[in-house]
Amino acid sequence: MNPSFYPNQFDCIVVGAGHAGTEAAYISAKAGLKTLLITMNLDTIGQMSCNPAIGGIAKGHMVREVDALGGLMGRVIDQTGIQFKMLNTSKGPSVWAPRAQAEKKQYQLMIKHQLEKLQQLSIRQDTVEDLIVEGNQVTGVITGRGFTFYTNHVILTTGTFLSSVIHIGTYQKESGRIGEPTTKGLSHTLARFELRLGRLKTGTPARVHKNSINFDGLEIQDGDENPRPFSFSTKKIDRKQIPCFITYTNDTTHELIKQNLEYSPMYSGQIKSVGPRYCPSIEDKVVRFAERDRHQIFIEPEGYETNEMYLNGVSTSLPEEVQWKFLRSIKGLEQVELMRPGYAIEYDYVDPTELHPTLETKKVKGLYHAGQINGTTGYEEAAAQGLVAAYNVIRSVRKEEPILFKRSESYIGVLVDDLVYKGVEDPYRMFTSRAEYRLLLRQDNADQRLMQYGYEMGLVEESLYKDMKDRYARIESIKSHLFVSAMKPSPELTKVLEEKQITNYKFGHSLSSFLKRSDIKIKDLEPIVSELSILNEDEKAVLEMEVKYEGYLKRELETIEYRKKFLNFQIPIDFDYASVKGLKTEAIVKLEKHRPLNLENALHISGVDPSDVDLLLYHLVDRH
């Protein structure tokens, strides 16, 4: 029973304070909703349970999208990063991706500090053991210490803590992270509501002592000389950067692992759930990729003030003594000392096809799920979902229409669409290959694509929004100039042509056509086009990309318009899919299960291909 002075009525309650929960609570409270964040330990708010890094391929795109929408992750990593790197710069701009190593503890403390500053946010250390539901509407939560808090909107962000078990060899313990308790009450609650539960597995590598590593002869991986921020509000990164190191497994390592596979919970049958396909354990790598004579390991620092080092690439649940043995067979780690062992963890998740695209459950109104409870893996995927859930809670409280992010405008849209329509068979990780329109969904233009949503919701400052509009107005102005202005002879141009060994150049072509040449970069135009001086380096990079890839961008936009024209065609909720001649049996079963609202949603259901959607389109048009 709550004391009379204890506030117990909230607009939104967020359960769990990992990367989904902190983003959800931040967005909700920032928008003015009276919000309660409940976490089992205040000291682990925003904790990096696995790798001490933010961003990466496609993940960095999502961090920038979260930032453009008013979120927290990008700003905090800019303030706490210890190495910044733009990945994939040797490839096309659609797959360039920012990544940063974090000062792990400082990142966590900064997240907590940002939450504590919000006037509309209350933070409580407790667990949630049950939900109060009247009819099919959530009305509150009951905590482990017996308190009741009331709300019509609950966001569950329980991470890996639902009925979780950790495994190290034959050792098993009910735990959400090593040394932390599990929670079972909510698993029973969700089952009671007939939400489909499943089991997934993830893992983490050992943490080792820096002073026990011999760095001589290891490959050094430095950060970028001129690091680019994640947040559009960060003007410059001026933090001291420290290197990572690279080493490799070898035949001896692999043999030691093979000799001890019977003690691996994954191979002994002790673990029956499915692990992440794209982040396999070292045991899996050795077995599945037996033809490889080595596997790469990144030795990553966890901060300036700690000697803990993270061994990226050797996630394992082998017995602790085996971990010592195989790690000491690796170059640079011959005398390594483990500070924390690697381990695997099994946990409950809820089938995400139980959710609407708002991340609200279909069976319980006002109940939203975000993060690993939806079968995803990764801090960035979690943060994106926390933001989506919070955006839609805000819309609900304000009695406004929900916000549905489209695949054509964001990786966040791709993520949610994949989850709620295709579901997951193993922990879901975002890749650029999952996005059909990835040339439009670049990391550099996330603000142009999404910031208006955040501004209209009151989550992005007017000054930041105005800066964005001014930025793209400048870029568009120069781009128009390049397309309408012809190349003319000049001493500056002659010098560029000589340096590039370009002969017999025909004048009269546009400046844009000159820039489209593979041997010409935007910097080559600077002596010729004085107007470029009004752009900063990032703006010039955007301009160059939009000119060079103009044809591809135009084609993607045309494809989007075509789909808008036809794929938004509504499907009646009681539509008889079996009546469509030629539709595959698998497609009929999947369509009847998911009941998509329109043809675009139908296209994104696993087991339904474009030819099935074409048949549906013809049938629906004939009916009308």
Swiss-Prot record:
Keyword Lipid biosynthesis in annotation: no
Main localization category: cytoplasm
Key words, A-Z: Cytoplasm, FAD, Flavoprotein, NAD, tRNA processing
InterPro entries in UniProt: FAD/NAD-bd_sf, GIDA_C_N, MnmG, MnmG-rel, MnmG-rel_CS, MnmG_C, MnmG_C_subdom, MnmG_C_subdom_sf
Entry's Gene Ontology cellular component terms: cytosol
Needed co-factor(s): FAD
Assembly: Homodimer. Heterotetramer of two MnmE and two MnmG subunits.
Name of the protein: tRNA uridine 5-carboxymethylaminomethyl modification enzyme MnmG
